Amino acid sequence: MHPIQSLIEQAFENRAEITPATVSPELKAAIEQVITELDNGHLRVAEKNGAEWVVNQWVKKAVLLSFRIRDNAVQDDGVNRYFDKVDTKFADWSQARFQEAGFRVVPGAVARKGSFIAKNTVLMPSYVNIGAYVDEGTMVDTWATVGSCAQIGKNVHLSGGVGIGGVLEPLQANPTIIEDNCFIGARSEIVEGVIVGEGSVISMGVYIGQSTKIYDRETGEVMYGRVPPGSVVVSGNLPSKDGSHSLYCAVIVKKVDAQTRSKTSINELLRGV
């Protein structure tokens, strides 16, 4: 157990009573320590243990508590002014700090303090929220949003306008997770703690939440909340039992392994589905 976990857990039970005026110095320091460790990647809201993801709920609780202990304040990044409770990640970064971190941030990109960005990542004009973890070699494309506490794997491509849901608004139990080597097509939305398995390809305009049916056309199986590894997914519809209407679903049209994916472009995988 982390040394400050019990303090965070206890404070969360009494969170309604915590304000910037009433928070104890000990609790404030503990919360700020969690945000700092999230920011540098030493802590994560969720970690993979074997084949399963384990959520560190106490870390998520610390993120939520951080909004209780600070007042809004004016922030200035040299171009824009903000009025918020959470600092921007790069507010005091020097050129040397950016070079050491080893990722690229283009004008218009915003990341909040408490998010982690790994080496060889590119942030186009996009938004990365507090508690999020973006792993190595990932592209966060223009107008993509990585929600609070979301976990993005290695070598992921989040295309233009993609939305990866957070846990803060509305409050969710588990973070949304995109595993390594996934491609998420433009304007798609993955939310509500859905897990997209390693090596999957999500086509443009696919929306998946916990209540979305994920239909495997090869097996006829319907599943919820998790896209199996290596899935190629497009948007579709499933008819009602009486045939009077159909409702939206996500359709797994094929499965691909790493070898096939390495030899095949994304466009080719999505053709002829």
From Swiss-Prot:
One cellular component (GO) term of this entry: cytoplasm
Catalyzed chemical reaction(s): (S)-2,3,4,5-tetrahydrodipicolinate + succinyl-CoA + H2O = (S)-2-succinylamino-6-oxoheptanedioate + CoA
Pathway field: Amino-acid biosynthesis; L-lysine biosynthesis via DAP pathway; LL-2,6-diaminopimelate from (S)-tetrahydrodipicolinate (succinylase route): step 1/3
A GO molecular function held by the record: nucleotidyltransferase activity
Record Pfam families: Hexapep_2, THDPS_N_2
GO terms for biological process, alphabetical: diaminopimelate biosynthetic process; lysine biosynthetic process via diaminopimelate
EC number: 2.3.1.117
Keywords: Acyltransferase, Amino-acid biosynthesis, Cytoplasm, Diaminopimelate biosynthesis, Lysine biosynthesis, Repeat, Transferase
Chain residues that bind substrate: 104, 141
Subcellular location: Cytoplasm
CDD domains with a match to the protein in the record: LbH_THP_succinylT
Lineage top rank: taxon: Bacteria
Sequence similarity: Belongs to the transferase hexapeptide repeat family.
Name of the featured protein: 2,3,4,5-tetrahydropyridine-2,6-dicarboxylate N-succinyltransferase
